[in-house]
Structure formats: structure tokens, C-alpha cells
């Protein structure tokens, strides 16, 4: 906690003083790219990704220790009947991750990615956002701090993912609170909500945002009122990565909602981040556009678990490999353009 005694103060200070990109590393990467055995721009976004890696790591583009971090939380709003699955599924899926049986496990193995799963007090769901704040400021700040530990073991590329029954309801509420519009524009099926369940989900988002409307101009206050533990932890992880010069790939609709809170607090807060994919959740593309980002993949996925970010990590690894491993014109004895 800060000297002032307010739990969010340290995070506000951090958001005001975010480190920027490394200009010298970016120049060096561009100079090397100009000498590689290919026409300028021929690798398209792979070149942009290599430059992004250099700028935010401060060194030549390389990915040696990529990590997928999944944050799991439960939500009191599920009491409103917003999802066909019980909250117990969150803990069951955490066990599935540990046993290696989930989709993210297979993607991590196939792409040689590390995996960490963070269980965020699953036995204590957050407050029902249609009736009260999800978290106190103290609890929200503590969970952000816990999320910052995601990179403690060392990583050079962080993929942000989540698991939590009810958290697409939370994401929709965050987006409605941040950007306005209607609940229908931001609410999607999530884990399969349709019919009356979908109607209850829309109603819950409307009610939650109306209840907290007078307190949503402050992004961190919005997060504690409408968010959840995995939202706070993902925000903390993204901030820690910025400070430690670790580039980030953000996963789907829920992870993007967490990132959007940081962007609202500081317009440059996500400059070290890529969006891994656009999900099948209807509001995700709209949320990405609000961030001014372009997703790497569009596969119609809407699973969460960091799966889209993990698949995108394969592209980022390939970009780094091309930049570092390709021969220059001089090395290969290939004539450059005159």
C-alpha cells in the first residue's frame, strides 16, 4: 500500500510513469531487417512484430521463454442465471489444466510455451455486480499485485488468458461502462447462453452499469465495481510486464476487457501489447477497434484459456526467428537491389 494509505495509489503512480519503447533497439532492428535476403516489407506483419519485440525488450528480437498465464476467478453475478454452467466448472477446469487435458495444454505443447495457472480464491466469488461492487479497493489492489507475480519466474513473452464462469458477463459490463452503447451490443453467448439465459445476461449487464453509473469515470474504480479477480490480476500482469520489458499478447474478449481498463487510465498503457486474435464473441472486434489494435488471428474461437494468444505466440516466435536467423545479402552472396 502507498504512503497515502489508498490501495490504488501505487497503481495510479505506475500508470502515470510507464516506461516507453527503446528507440536504439528499434533502429538496430530496422537496420538489420533492411539487410536480410528479402524485398523490403515482404514479410509483412512479421517484420512489424520483430520491430515491436525489439522496441519493448530493448534488444534484438528473440523469444526464448514464452509463457501463457491463465487467471481463474468466480463471479457472484452468476446467481442471476447468466450462464448455463455452474460456477463449480471454474475449479474443475483449473484441475483439467493441471492434468494437461485442456485445449490450452495441447497448444502450449505444440508451440513450446510455458504455462502457469493462477487460482484466485475460487471458493469466494466476487460480489454480484447487479447488487454491489465486485471487490473492495483493497481486495482489487491486492489481486492486481498478485497478478504482477505472473512474470516472477522470468519470461520474455507473456500471453494473457483467463477462466471463469460468468466472466463474459463481466467483460460486457466493463465495455458498456467504458464505451457506452447498449448491453445488447456487448453481450454475447459466452459459454453458450441463449434464449432466456441470454436475456437475463443482457438484463444483468444493464442493471450493473446503471447501479454503478456514478462511479465509472475512474477506470480503476470501474474495475473494482464491475470486474473480477481475474480482471484485476490480468491488469496487474500487463502492468508488470511493461515495467520489466516483457511484450504481451492479449487473448480474447475477457482479457481484452481487462486491458481496456488500463488503456482508459493511460492511452499508451497497451503499446507493449498485441491482440492475439479476434474471438467469435460478438463484442470482441468492437472492443479491439476501441483500442486501435489489429488482431493477429481470426479463427472463430471463443474458448478463452489464453488459446488465441498462445496460437499467436507461434507467429511472434516465427517473426523473431526470421529476424535473427535469416542471412543478410552479404552473408548469402545474394545481390541486393541497386
Curated annotation (Swiss-Prot):
The keyword Magnesium does not apply. The active site is at residue 305. GO terms for biological process: cobalamin biosynthetic process. Keywords: Cobalamin biosynthesis, Glycosyltransferase, Transferase. Its EC number is 2.4.2.21. Pathway: Nucleoside biosynthesis; alpha-ribazole biosynthesis; alpha-ribazole from 5,6-dimethylbenzimidazole: step 1/2. GO terms for molecular function: nicotinate-nucleotide-dimethylbenzimidazole phosphoribosyltransferase activity. NCBIfam families: cobT_DBIPRT, PRK00105.1. PANTHER family: NICOTINATE-NUCLEOTIDE--DIMETHYLBENZIMIDAZOLE PHOSPHORIBOSYLTRANSFERASE. Catalyzes the synthesis of alpha-ribazole-5'-phosphate from nicotinate mononucleotide (NAMN) and 5,6-dimethylbenzimidazole (DMB). Homodimer. Belongs to the CobT family. This is Nicotinate-nucleotide--dimethylbenzimidazole phosphoribosyltransferase. The gene is cobU.
Amino acid at each position: 500500500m502507498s504512503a497515502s494509505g489508498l490501495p490504488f495509489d501505487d497503481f495510479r503512480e505506475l500508470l502515470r510513469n510507464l516506461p516507453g519503447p527503446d528507440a536504439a533497439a528499434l533502429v538496430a532492428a530496422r537496420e538489420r531487417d533492411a539487410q536480410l535476403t528479402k524485398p523490403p516489407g515482404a514479410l509483412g506483419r512479421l517484420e512489424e512484430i520483430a520491430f515491436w519485440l525489439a522496441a519493448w525488450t530493448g534488444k534484438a528480437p528473440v523469444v526464448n521463454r514464452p509463457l501463457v498465464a491463465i487467471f481463474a476467478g468466480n463471479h457472484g453475478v452468476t446467481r442471476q442465471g447468466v450462464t448455463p454452467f455452474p460456477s463449480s466448472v471454474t475449479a474443475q477446469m483449473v484441475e483439467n489444466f493441471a492434468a494437461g487435458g485442456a485445449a490450452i495444454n495441447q497448444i502450449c505443447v505444440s508451440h513450446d510455451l510455458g504455462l502457469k495457472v493462477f487460482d484466485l480464491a475460487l471458493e469466494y466469488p466476487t460480489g454480484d455486480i447487479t447488487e454491489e461492487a465486485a471487490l473492495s479497493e483493497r481486495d482489487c489492489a491486492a489481486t492486481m499485485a498478485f497478478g504482477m507475480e505472473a512474470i516472477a519466474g522470468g519470461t520474455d513473452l507473456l500471453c494473457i488468458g483467463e477462466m471463469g464462469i460468468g466472466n463474459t458477463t463481466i467483460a460486457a459490463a466493463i465495455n458498456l461502462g467504458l464505451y457506452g452503447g447498449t448491453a445488447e451490443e456487448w453481450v454475447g453467448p459466452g459459454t453458450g447462453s441463449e434464449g432466456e439465459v441470454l436475456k437475463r445476461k443482457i438484463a444483468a449487464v444493464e442493471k450493473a452499469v446503471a447501479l454503478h453509473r456514478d462511479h465509472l469515470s475512474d477506470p480503476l474504480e470501474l474495475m473494482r465495481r464491475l470486474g473480477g479477480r481475474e480482471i484485476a490480476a490480468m491488469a496487474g500482469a500487463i502492468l508488470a510486464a511493461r515495467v520489466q520489458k516483457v511484450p504481451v499478447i492479449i487473448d480474447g474478449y475477457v482479457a481484452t476487457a481487462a486491458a481496456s481498463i488500463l488503456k482508459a487510465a493511460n492511452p499508451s498503457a497497451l503499446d507493449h501489447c498485441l491482440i492475439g486474435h479476434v474471438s467469435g464473441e460478438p463484442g470482441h472486434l468492437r472492443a479491439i477497434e476501441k483500442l486501435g489494435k489489429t488482431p493477429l488471428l481470426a479463427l472463430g474461437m471463443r474458448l478463452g484459456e489464453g488459446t488465441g494468444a498462445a496460437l499467436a505466440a507461434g507467429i511472434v516466435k516465427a517473426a523473431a526467428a526470421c529476424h535473427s536467423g535469416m542471412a543478410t545479402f552479404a552473408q548469402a552472396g545474394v545481390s541486393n537491389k541497386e
